């Protein structure tokens, strides 16, 4: 078994860093289009946590109705946003996917953004990965665990193999 988080050692990692925090609607459109690109291995969305309850002051314990805390749909799964979408990190299997994602960003983001290539996602397990996921963790989840999050808050969306098989039958 390989220590790599992906099947290819020469994967490409990119970071999309918009100059503004994305609204839930824009985040849904962008993530939906990224989800459709062939060659995407894994995606991590990063940003400030949106509080669920008031933690201090006179309203301690009251529920917070934040306008950015809305459910979004990616593929067939509905997810409640618990963060402000600030940056998106993507691991890709080829350079063609990189250009497709750049085109998607240019089409959907009406404001400037940085599009960088580098090493953003870990490929070897950290202490947090070991504590949260165990010794036999899925390599695609390595480096993607928030140390403060509970294990039930981790969201993993896998492309449906049935959809890919249907595409092969149609061709």
Swiss-Prot record:
It holds the Pfam family MCR_D. It comes from the Archaea. Keywords: Methanogenesis. InterPro entries: Me_CoM_Rdtase_D. GO terms for biological process: methanogenesis. NCBIfam families: met_CoM_red_D. MCR is composed of three subunits: alpha, beta, and gamma. The function of proteins C and D is not known. This is Methyl-coenzyme M reductase operon protein D. It comes from Methanosarcina barkeri (strain Fusaro / DSM 804). The lineage of its organism: Archaea, Methanobacteriati, Methanobacteriota, Stenosarchaea group, Methanomicrobia.
């Amino acid at each position: 078994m390989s220590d790599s988080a992906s099947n290819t050692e020469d994967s490409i990692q990119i970071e999309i860093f918009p100059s503004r925090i994305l609204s839930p609607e824009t985040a849904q459109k962008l993530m939906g289009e990224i989800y459709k690109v062939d060659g995407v291995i894994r995606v991590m969305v990063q940003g400030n946590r949106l509080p669920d309850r008031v933690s201090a002051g006179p309203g301690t314990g009251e529920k917070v109705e934040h306008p950015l805390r809305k459910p979004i749909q990616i593929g067939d799964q509905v997810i409640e946003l618990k963060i402000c979408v600030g940056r998106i990190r993507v691991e890709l299997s080829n350079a063609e996917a990189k250009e497709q994602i750049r085109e998607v960003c240019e089409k959907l983001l009406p404001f400037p953004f940085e599009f960088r290539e580098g090493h953003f996602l870990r490929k070897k397990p950290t202490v947090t990965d070991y504590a949260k996921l165990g010794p036999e963790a899925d390599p695609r989840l390595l480096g993607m665990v928030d140390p403060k999050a509970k294990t039930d808050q981790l969201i993993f969306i896998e492309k449906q193999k049935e959809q890919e098989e249907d595409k092969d039958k149609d061709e």
